[in-house]
């Protein structure tokens, strides 16, 4: 079985301090900071944008209902979300 990856949708990084982290990425790497509403009454999220790429910045103490995440998240860990034309059945 092979899945055709078309691109990277986004990356999520877990951090202990969202404000400090986005300040660093913005100041040092020139990334644009955006805050967006994920909908469904969830807490607003902060992301870093550069070109067509996005990094979501997740606080380590985020509610698991607000952020779907691994059972053992830690500062410095991350997750990748890919874009694909493959279906779940494939």
For every predicted segment, state its role.
Residues 1-8, 15-35, 49-90:
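Glyoxalase I/VOC metalloenzyme domain signal
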Residues 40-44:
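Short acidic/glycine-enriched loop/turn segments that link adjacent beta-strands
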């Amino acid at each position: 079985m092979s899945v055709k990856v078309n691109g990277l949708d986004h990356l999520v990084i877990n951090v202990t301090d969202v404000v400090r982290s986005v300040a660093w990425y913005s100041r040092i790497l020139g990334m644009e900071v955006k805050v967006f509403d994920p909908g469904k009454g969830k807490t607003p999220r902060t992301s870093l944008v550069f070109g067509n790429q996005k990094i979501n910045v997740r606080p380590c103490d985020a509610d698991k209902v607000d952020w779907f995440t691994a059972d053992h998240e830690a500062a410095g860990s991350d997750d990748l979300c890919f874009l694909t034309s493959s279906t779940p059945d494939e």
